[in-house]
């Protein structure tokens, strides 16, 4: 932030985003020139929000929040900025520098597929006063009373994965790739050295079932599915080893202490 003293930092972020869009389009161009069959995608941190009530104000808030997610893929899939994003720039007085050549490149080389991460869902409301909040992948939101929570307060919502798949595929009509899905939890090593993580098995089973339904019942074109992650590693959202995702346990604590021995869960 110190480098941009005197500037609107949010505007700086959107300017950087524009450069990323152009770079992505150029990368797609190069990949297709080298191999016409090569597929290049974009990546979304897929936050799924539900309106907390059926009040129009809450539904509008949910729509606005989802636009904050979709503005990236709307641009990279369609090859041009959505009108709502350009209107936001205008309303806020942002002057995002972009050339005609930039816009031509973006239009000519959109992505071929959409990859995304999905861990949980949450609710949003126009007025959050008095409502219980819940943690999430990148931000806090309103707790959904119909969904259980993980050890870190993330809402466990397998059906939300199906909803995400359907929303994305209906919006873009391009193949999807689920590249992150998993449960961060506290694992206990038993006296015999075993680690029983039935809760993680249940989480993955139910999410895979909903993923399958999106294919068989909703017609979603899904390229693939990968979990986060095959082995315990430092959780980016909390900087903790104790927030474990893997199928393989690593003997190390939040402070780097341990043997680093690996064990099958």
What are these regions (language model features)?
Residues 1-265:
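Active-site region of glycoside hydrolase catalytic domains
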